[in-house]
Amino acid sequence: MTRSLFLLLASACWAQQPPAPLTFPHQTEADWVAHDFTFHSGEKLAELRMHYITVGVPARDASGHVSNAVIVMHGTGGSGRAFLSAGFGGELFREGQPLDAATHYIILPDDVGHGKSSKPSDGLRAKFPHYDYEDMVRAEYALVHDGLRVDHLRLVMGTSMGAMHTWIWGELYPDFMDALMPLASAPVEIAGRNRMFRAMIIQAIRNDPEWKNGEYTKPPEQGLIAAQYALWMMTSSALQLHKTNPTHEKADAAVAALRERAIRTDANDMLYYFEASTDYDPSPGLEKIKAPLYAVNSADDEVNPPELGILEREIKRVPHGRYILLPTSDETRGHGTHSRPVVWKQYLIELLKESDRHAALLNPRHEFWAQSAPEAFHVKLATTQGDFTIEVHRDWAPLGAARFYNLVRAGFYDNSRFYRVVPNYIAQFGIAGDPAVAAVWRSESLADDPASQHNVRGTVAYAMTGPNARTTQIYINLKDNLQNDPQGFAPFGRVTEGWSVVEKLYGGYAENSGGGMRAGKQAPLFEGGNAYLDREFPRLDRLLSAQVL
C-alpha cells in the first residue's frame, strides 16, 4: 500500500491503524473485566473485557486524588493503539508537548465492540448485547474509576465517535474532569446526511444474502464493500483525495485497495459500530456540562458540515464552551483532521490553560493563588464602552493588590457586569457572572490593609461590608470620596488610561441593579449571575476581559 493511500484510509473515522506505533515512557497494556455489565437494551455480559493502554504514571495530590490523568477515546472501528502514532502521540505525548508522558497519565481504551475489548466477533456474533454510546461511556468510566482507581481526569478528549463520547462524559460525570475536547462531532441527534450514510452502511450489510442474520459462514463481501465505499466518501477530504490521486490510474488503485480492506472487516462488528450511534443525542443536557469545553471541527468535514450551523447554535448552551472551526488547508484531512494534532494542538494548549484557571476559580486553596504580585503592574479592562487601564501599586495595599492580581490572572472578572454605577460617586464590579464561582468567593474575606492612600477620583479599592470583609468586589471612585477613608477603604491602584471610558459606563440603574451590599441585597446577583442581570438590567455595561499587561 502506498503512503498516500494509507493516509487516506487512516483519515476515515474508523480506520485508524498507524503503520508503526511509537513507545512512550511507562507504557503498559492490559485488560480489565467489568462483571455483570448491564446494557441499556437490558442484555447483560457476565464479563465485559476492556482492553487499554496507559502511558506515564498517575500522580496524586496531598489528598490522594489523581491529578494528571487524561483519557483519549478513539473513533468508530478504531482502537487506543492508534494514538501511539508519530502523527498523534508524537505531537502530544513527547517531552515538552501538551500531554507530555513524563507529567501525564494517559489512558487509551479500546471501546466496547472495538479492538481487543469484548466484541461480537469474539464468538457471540449477532447474540452479542446491543450497545449504545452511553453504554460505551459507562464502560469507559468503569475502567477509569474502578479498574485504574482514577477519581478525577485532567482532560477528556476524543475523536469522531470518541468526540461524541466526550459530550456524554461531560453530562454524565460533570464533576469528574477539568476539561473536555471533542474533535469532529456535533452534540445533537444524528440526522440528515450523517444518519443516511450510516443507514446505508447498515442496510448494505443486512441486505447482503450472505449476512444470514449475523450467522454467516462466508463474509457478506458485497455488503461490506458498499458500506466501506459510503464511509470513505463521507470521511475523506476532496482536496486530499485529488492531491494524492491526480490520475485515473491512481484513483482506481485506491478504490481497489479499499475493497480489499473492506472484505477483511468483520460484518457483525461493523454493523454494531454504526447501530450504536442510533440514539445518540446529548443536546437536552448541554447545560449540565461544567468544565471548560473546546469543540473542534474542520471546514472540510463532510460528516459534520459547518454550513448546518449546529455548533454555533449549541455551544452557547455550554456554560464554558467554545467552538473552533479549522479552515480547509493543505494540513486538514476532512473528518480525519481530528487525528492531526499539528492542526489543532494550539487550542489544546489554550484549553489546558483555561481549565487550570477554572479549577483555581473553584478552589481558593489552589496553588494558583500563591503567586505573588509584582511591586507595580497594569491591568487592561476591555468593556462594552472601550478599554481602560488600572495601575496597581502593591505597597499601597499589599493583600488587596495580590488578590486583584491573581483574580485577573484567573479570569475571574472576564464576562462580568458593571452592576452598580452611581453617577458622580462610584462604578462597581467584581461579582463573577458564573454563580458557581461567585458562591465560592462570596465569603473568602481578606484581612484589612492599612489605608495609605486617599479615595480620590480615579482610585480603585475593594467594596466591603465592614472590617476584614474584602472579597472580590471593586469600585472606582468617580469623584473624590474622602468620606470613605476613615471607614477603612484602602485604594490599591488608580485608572491611568481610558478615563473617558469609565465615565461612559451606564449608570441609569444606579443603586437598583447591584447596591445594598451592606444590607444583604445582592443575593440575586450571586444566585442568578449574568443571566439575572442581563434579564433584569439589560443596559448594564460588560467587563469583557481583564488582562495583566
Regions found by a protein language model. Name each.
Residues V318-A360:
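Catalytic active-site module of serine/aspartate enzymes centered on a nucleophile-bearing elbow/loop
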Residues F176-E260:
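Alpha/beta-hydrolase-fold enzymes
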Residues D151-R195:
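Conserved hydrolase catalytic core segment
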